[in-house]
Design a protein with these regions (language model features):
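N-terminal intrinsically disordered/low-complexity leader segments
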Residues: 1-9, 72-81, 215-225
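Hydrophobic/aromatic-rich alpha-helical bundle segments in the mid-to-C-terminal region
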Residues: 2, 108-110, 114, 128-140, ...
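Helix-turn-helix
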Residues: 2, 13, 21-63
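Hydrophobic alpha-helical connector segments
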Residues: 59, 73-112, 163-167, 198
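Alpha-helical bundle regulatory/interaction domains
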Residues: 60, 70, 78, 209-214
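A short secondary-structure junction motif
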Residues: 67-71, 75, 108, 120, ...
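Helix-loop "lid/cap" segments that line or gate small-molecule binding pockets
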Residues: 96-107, 115-123, 204-210
Length: 225
């Protein structure tokens, strides 16, 4: 006879199964029958834990947003050694973020949240809006300061971009690179891979922000150049 899981454990099991189904099919096309089958329970038991698909979706979002915070955290600007070297802050942020995106499978990063983001973008956008607002709220002020410092130091030139716009451009590049690396064999025909692809992405977006090649080269992590 199969052992009955405690209520809390069963709830977590349902949320985990639902996350996989929502990520694969999106909110609109996912069904409670599919979720119940993935969780290996009856639809009736599913409704004992969650009164509706909407309630279950909200529970999944609350759970996955914590996992996605790990990736969002790599977009945070940090001050190396307590200095006000804006270029160094920006380059380290780009390096950390693109490394996390490109090495997702190698580092065993849980990409369920990212798959759900893609499904949300193809659907009603609820989760995508939540994630983008959350990421911006956490990072935009530090990014703005780093951009200002880099410009004041002469490392960043050209048209001034709003920090929110810069953050969105960077996220879009990283997000698509992560998307192409979700499978065991990357689907995008990049000429480079691994650490070299990270380096090229840093130079690409660093130049887009207005950083000079000299500033990027000077501040790129020495053991990764």
């Amino acid at each position: 006879m199969r052992k009955r899981l405690p209520f809390a454990d069963r709830t977590r099991s349902i949320i985990s199964a639902a996350a996989t189904i929502f990520a694969a099919h999106g909110f609109e096309r996912a069904t409670t029958k599919q979720i119940a089958e993935a969780a290996k329970i009856s639809p009736a038991l599913l409704y004992e834990h969650f009164p509706s698909k909407e309630a279950l979706y909200r529970a999944v979002l609350r759970s996955l947003i914590k996992d996605q915070d790990r990736l969002v955290a790599t977009l945070a600007v940090r001050r190396p050694g307590g200095t006000a070297d804006g270029a160094a802050e920006l380059v380290m942020m780009l390096y950390s973020y693109f490394s996390a995106c490109i090495m997702a499978n190698t580092n065993e990063l849980d990409v369920t949240a990212h798959r759900l983001l893609l499904a949300s973008l193809a659907g009603d956008g609820t989760y995508a809006r939540l994630l983008y607002r959350r990421a911006l709220r956490k990072n935009v002020n530090a990014l703005s300061t780093a951009l200002d410092n880099a410009r004041a130091n002469g490392d960043l030139t050209g048209e001034t971009l709003a920090a929110a716009t810069s953050a969105s451009f960077i996220e879009h590049v990283g997000s698509m690179m992560l998307s192409t690396h979700l499978l065991e064999k990357p689907v995008a025909p990049y000429a480079d891979a691994g650490a070299e692809l990270v380096r090229k992405a840093v130079f690409f977006c660093g130049r887009g922000l207005g950083l000079s090649d000299a500033a990027i080269a000077r501040t790129y992590p020495a053991d990764c150049a």
